Regions:
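A cytosolic small-molecule/anion-sensing beta-strand core signal
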Residues: 37-38, 53-54, 72
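Amphipathic alpha-helical segments enriched in hydrophobic/aromatic residues interleaved with Lys/Arg
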Residues: 86-123
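Short acidic-glycine-tyrosine-enriched beta hairpin
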Residues: 47-63
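Generic protein-terminus/edge-of-domain signal
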Residues: 1-50
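Short histidine-centered beta-strand/loop micro-motifs
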Residues: 21-28, 68-71, 90-91
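Short hydrophobic beta-strand segments that form the core of ligand-binding sensory/regulatory domains
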Residues: 57, 76-82, 107, 111
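Ligand-binding loop in jelly-roll beta-barrel domains
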Residues: 63-86
């Protein structure tokens, strides 16, 4: 199991992430949205697998096991959302699912990613 989140998520968070070719597994008590930016990754949530690229995303409910691996160079915008957050519609996370992203929304995701990159501490 991956331990990206040892500390409980009590407020929404945003991060830019890239994933390696070796498959990892995660399970946590908060909702997550993984939006493709560059390259591709493969993700399986509750037994359903899909590729994520710049035109797609995964909606992952709290408590859903997900297995994932990057395909070559890749980068995703990851939103971590507390399961009890009032601002998150409960029906959005009734079930895990991959979704296609509208091209206009893809542009917005890129702008958010650029701002997140500027705000991130140097690694």
């Amino acid at each position: 199991m991956n331990s990206h989140h040892v500390i409980p998520v009590t407020a929404p968070g945003i991060a830019l992430r890239g994933y390696g070719a070796i498959e990892e597994t995660d399970l946590h008590d908060f909702h997550q949205i993984v939006l493709g930016l560059d390259g591709e990754m493969v993700m399986t949530v509750d037994g359903v697998g899909e590729r994520i690229d710049q035109g797609s995303a995964w909606l992952i409910p709290a408590g859903a096991r997900h297995d994932y691996a990057g395909i070559g160079e890749n980068r995703q915008l990851v939103l971590d959302l507390p399961a009890a957050a009032l601002a998150v519609p409960e029906r959005l996370f009734n079930t895990a699912r991959a979704v296609r992203i509208d091209p206009a929304l893809t542009k917005l995701v890129r702008k958010i990613a650029q701002r997140a990159a500027l705000a991130a501490p140097p690694s």
